[in-house]
């Protein structure tokens, strides 16, 4: 009897595909054709059109700019952006991102977290009742 693989993740063979399409096929598609492959929320966002400033960000990608800085966290990552560098503002600083094929269809903000995990240190002297009687060093 053949032994089954216990891994739940699909094994990666060859190049990346998005909904059955290779990256080269995706890059040849128009926005409307690509939108048909996306979930409903992203598809509706594309059909509603882009603002002038969002069109400016897309134009910077097309012009081959080395790194694009933006505050647009809700913009969708398109196949033509693959391999480019992006800097997304998280409210404090610009977070550098290199766009990979696995990021297609996601939004810029997903890769630029706005909140960091807080790791608190130990309590100070006098912070708790038991620490009042601890001698200072």
Curated annotation (Swiss-Prot):
PROSITE patterns: RIBOSOMAL_S19. GO terms for cellular component: cytosolic small ribosomal subunit. GO terms for biological process: ribosomal small subunit assembly; translation. Transmembrane segments: none annotated. One of its GO terms (molecular function) is structural constituent of ribosome. Keywords: Ribonucleoprotein, Ribosomal protein, RNA-binding, rRNA-binding. It holds the Pfam family Ribosomal_S19. It comes from the Archaea. Residues 115-137 are annotated as: Disordered. InterPro entries: Ribosomal_uS19, Ribosomal_uS19_CS, Ribosomal_uS19_euk/arc, Ribosomal_uS19_SF. NCBIfam families: PRK04038.1, uS19_arch. PANTHER family: RIBOSOMAL PROTEIN S19P FAMILY MEMBER, SMALL RIBOSOMAL SUBUNIT PROTEIN US19. Protein S19 forms a complex with S13 that binds strongly to the 16S ribosomal RNA. Belongs to the universal ribosomal protein uS19 family. This is Small ribosomal subunit protein uS19. It comes from Methanococcoides burtonii (strain DSM 6242 / NBRC 107633 / OCM 468 / ACE-M). The lineage of its organism: Archaea, Methanobacteriati, Methanobacteriota, Stenosarchaea group, Methanomicrobia.
């Amino acid at each position: 009897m053949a032994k089954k693989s216990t891994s739940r993740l699909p094994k990666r063979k060859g190049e990346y595909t998005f909904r059955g399409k290779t990256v080269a096929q995706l890059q040849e598609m128009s926005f409307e054709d690509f939108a048909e492959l996306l979930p409903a929320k992203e598809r509706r966002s594309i059909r509603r059109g882009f603002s002038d400033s969002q069109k400016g960000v897309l134009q910077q990608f097309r012009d081959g700019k080395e790194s694009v800085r933006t505050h647009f966290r809700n913009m969708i990552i398109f196949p033509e952006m693959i391999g480019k560098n992006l800097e997304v503002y998280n409210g404090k600083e610009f977070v550098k991102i290199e766009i990979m094929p696995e990021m297609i269809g996601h939004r810029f903000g997903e890769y630029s977290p706005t909140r960091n995990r807080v790791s608190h240190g130990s309590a100070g002297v006098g912070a708790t009742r038991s620490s009042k009687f601890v001698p200072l060093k």
